[in-house]
A protein has these predicted regions:
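Conserved loop-alpha-helix segment in the C-terminal half of the alpha/beta-hydrolase fold
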Residues: 185-222
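Flexible "cap/lid" loop of the alpha/beta hydrolase fold
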Residues: 82, 89-122
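Gly/Ala-rich beta-loop-alpha elbow adjacent to hydrolase catalytic centers
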Residues: 69, 73, 77
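Catalytic histidine-centered segment of alpha/beta-hydrolase-like enzymes
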Residues: 220-231
């Protein structure tokens, strides 16, 4: 299984799901470009990530894999499936953020530029706990800060990521959606508490028209961090695509 995190995330976020719920499955969860301990060098595009992941699969995977992805990672996953159908057998897409409104993406990018960091770890934790991580177990949130929050030179704190890369990626989310090829089993999970919803009606319609019976849409009662909030449910959906 290949697991792809969302924008501003990192691969280690998948560790609780992999070790506690999918321990019998081999999981690769790399940091995407500009995130975590991956290269921060440009280009910061979906295409560059697809090329890097295809190379990873060519060197490491002995057979086609199920790709599980979250948010921005879903855009990468779908384009990877389209570019390399020989390497991708199925997709599980958790609250996918793809083909979104450009004006909305500009608002989010502007907000990130205006407030990119925090005065303390406590402020960083509160920002997540009062936002899309509100329904995630406190221990998982603590691990996120331990793994991903770093001190900055000016005495503030920020996530282990390249800010220029993040701004570029918000634009990438407004690109036209690249759909997986016919025959790709695809499960989309809509997070019921994400408002406004990232999962657009157009995405659902386009996937249903392209994939027919190979497409499944399900809704989970959680906020945007689906794998962290509902790991058992996500693990069950992944196993369905591995049969």
């Amino acid at each position: 299984m290949l697991a792809l995190h969302g924008l501003t995330g990192h691969g280690k976020r998948w560790e609780p799901l992999a070790t506690q719920h999918l321990s019998e499955i081999a999981v690769a969860a790399p940091d995407l470009i500009g995130h975590g301990r991956s290269s921060w060098a440009a280009p910061w595009t979906i295409d560059a990530n697809v090329a890097a992941l295809a190379e990873l699969l060519d060197h490491q995977a002995t057979s086609p894999v199920v790709v599980v992805a979250h948010s921005f990672g879903c855009a990468v996953a779908m384009q990877l499936a389209a570019a390399r159908p020989d390497r991708v057998t199925a997709l599980v897409l958790l609250d996918p953020a793809v083909g979104l409104d450009g004006a909305w993406m500009r608002e989010i990018a502007d907000a990130m530029l205006a407030s990119p960091d925090y005065s303390s770890p406590e402020e960083a934790r509160a920002a997540k706990a009062n936002g899309s991580w509100a329904d995630v177990d406190a221990a998982v949130l603590d691990a996120e800060l331990d793994d991903h929050l770093i001190p900055l030179p000016a005495g503030r704190y920020g996530w282990r990521l390249s800010l220029p890369a993040m701004i570029s990626y918000w634009s990438e989310l407004a690109r036209e959606t690249v759909l997986p090829p016919n025959g790709t089993g695809t499960t989309v999970v809509r997070a019921a508490r994400t408002s406004p919803s990232y999962v657009t009606d157009r995405l659902v319609t386009d996937l249903r028209e392209r994939l027919g019976p190979d497409f499944r849409l399900t809704t989970l009662e959680c906020d945007h961090m689906v794998a962290e909030a509902k790991p058992a449910d996500v693990a069950a959906l992944i196993r369905e695509r591995m049969r």
